[in-house]
Amino acid sequence: MRHSSLLALAAFCLITIPGMPSRADSQAEGPFLREQQLRPLPGQLDEVLLLNDNNPELITGEGVLLSTFPANQGLNVALDGRFDLFSHHVYAGKPEELASTLWLAVLAQPLGTEPVTLDVISGSTSLSQGTKPGQTAAPFLPLPSLMAETTTPIASGPGSRVAGDLLRGEQAPELPKQIKIDPGHASALLVLPIPVAGLDPLLNGRNLQLRLNSSAPVYVATVAAYGNNDTPPSDQRWRALLSAGTRSPKEHQPTPRGSKGRMIYSRVSGVQIGSTWTGSLHDPGSKTLNINAAPISWPISSLERGDLGTAQVQTAELKTFDKGTAWAAHGNYGVEYDLTLPLHNPENSKRTVAIALESPDKRGSSNGKLQFKPGNSGPVMFRGPIEVTGLDGANGRAMGRRRFHLVLRRGQEGPELGKISLAPGESRRVRVRLVYPADATPPQVLTVLPVKQSNSSTDVHP
């Protein structure tokens, strides 16, 4: 998407969304604690395998990035039926060239002697910056904290764009719908460029996410190689790199599990167990969530030393991983959260609550207290889309799916995504979906906030 289109969208949304004052406006200039309920997130990850290819983030040399093949230091994991792939990398060019291109290939080979069909159930890919017409790209634009999406995708960065495409059920034109691979050798499913020609600085990135279904077991690998600018490496070149077992250099040796002191999470290069977290956010021992419990929050993408005092680590475990890389999928990047809030008003009068995704400072949050600060001037911790079904629309009626793009900074409350008003004894199921995007820093919290009755008529629908 062009810069001008997104900037126009930003201006439009800033005009058409009624201003919602921050709940931090009345606070002091320094950090403050909000006392409330903070519960572990109900539900769990599924067991779908996800190839997590994120180490190195910055690719500095050709070679195999991640391989499940049995030979040449591969992880020896066959993928059969449903599996996913998450790949996120950056390329900073060559010092001696101004127009080099790094190419990424996804290779696969059947275990047996029969051809295999791979269906792309859904997926997308995006560059940080496009250098040619037709390339899906999403620059890191300075978007406002909240933008309501209409018919045009809103994105800031490739991870944000791909996450939004997955929520919308859209697919980048660079991706096929189905791939058939012959036995006996590795075949390229995809070959995608990371170009830097004409960019200043020489820096570009690509995010790729695929949800796949294989008709029979296959081995899969991701490989990086230089091409002749616009000409990708040949099939023979890809196979030679895979067969030789040449490795692209890794980065960030992780702190061993269970160690004390400073923790280096590192990045993932392995096979992750779990691609979707599904849960119903009801009260313990009940099938509904009493809205009188608000404010109440649940962590999203909680991790080691980032559980916000809930003692819950949502991080997906790894079935196996490359030596010297992360030992768990810290951050759950690419994981979809599909959450249901069965809201209920047991009172004899109308009650209104608001839904928000927030980014408290994990360094000062624990034991039912979330630390925030006014001003929204800290580093960006989350940039990406979220989908909510069941918010109030006209006349308080529940709306269908609404999608928003958020840019949240460290210690930022809200902003509110919308409100839910319930009559006495009324219930409503609200659904929240997000794909945890690349370029975010966990954790965040999903929050149900109380709203004064006099303010319950605000509607963010443009």
Predicted regions and their residues:
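Activation corresponds to long, low-complexity, non-globular regions
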Residues: 26-56, 219-303
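Bacterial N-terminal signal peptides
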Residues: 8-17
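Long compositionally biased, domain-poor regions of proteins
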Residues: 25-27, 61-121, 125-126, 132-136, ...
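Intrinsically disordered, low-complexity linker/loop segments enriched in Gly/Pro
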Residues: 127, 140-201
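A broadly tuned preference for mixed-charge, low-complexity surface segments
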Residues: 157-178, 249-274, 395-416
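Bacterial N-terminal signal peptides that target proteins for export
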Residues: 1-8
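Large eukaryotic, non-enzymatic subunits of multiprotein complexes that serve as scaffolds/tethers
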Residues: 35, 43-48, 105, 128-131, ...
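Sec/Tat signal peptide C-region and signal peptidase I cleavage site
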Residues: 20-24
